[in-house]
Amino acid sequence: LTVAVLGLSVEKLKEVGYHPQFVTVHVPDHTGYYPSSQQMTLRLAFQPASGRLLSAQILGRRGVDKRIDVLSVALQGGMTVLDLENLELSYAPEYGSAKDPVNVLGMVAGNLLRGDLHTVTAAELEDHLDGWQIIDVQSPKVFAHGHVPGAINVPIDSLRNRLACIDKRQPVVVYSRVGYHGYLAYRTLVQLGYKVFNLDGGFKLFSEGGSRMGIASGEAS
C-alpha cells in the first residue's frame, strides 16, 4: 500500500487560515476490464473562489506515484481544478483509464466549484442527524451488509418510483458505495426541487474511518 501527500491536509490548511473546499474520490487505478484493477482513493483541496489547487493525498497500491507527480506539477504551475478536468495524460488499459483518476478528481472538484454539486462530510452529518434524511441508494443486499445509521434504503433504480418516502421539506443526504450512484441520485433529486447533499467519499470513506457514528446493519424495513 502506498500513501502520497502533497502539501497540507485539510485540517492543517484550516489551522493556517485557509478555508478550502475539498473532494474525495475512489477510482480504479487502471481500466476496470483489464485484470487486477484496484481502487485508489484521492483527496484534493482547493480554493473555493478560484479553484486553485492547495493540496492532495492519494492512497493506493499501484500508480500512486505518477498521479501525485502530476498533481505536484499542476499545483506548482498554479492550475485550477478546471485545468485538471482537461489534462491530456497517457493511456493504456494496464496502466490507466481513458479518464485518468486525476481527470476524475478534477471533474468532481469542478462540479463542486461550479455549484453543480454540494457535499457533506461524515463529521458534518453527525451534527445534523435529527434534521436530515439519509438515503442509501445501494441495493438491498449491500444495504443489509452495512449502512449509515438512520439511513433508509431507496435503490437508485427505484428512486423515481419512491419519491413519496422522501420529504421535500427536509434536507436530504444521499450516498452510494464510492459516490457515483450517489451523484446520480443527487442530480435526480435536485432537478425535482429537493435540497440535497452527496456524502463526500461515499460509504467507503464513512465505513473506513470517516465517522464516529459506527455502521448499522440489517435489511431495510
Region locations from a protein language model:
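Active-site proximal loops enriched in glycine and acidic residues that flank catalytic Cys/His/Asp
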Residues: 24, 46-48, 57-60, 138-139, ...
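Generic secondary-structure signature for well-ordered alpha-helical cores
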Residues: 1, 18, 76-80, 89
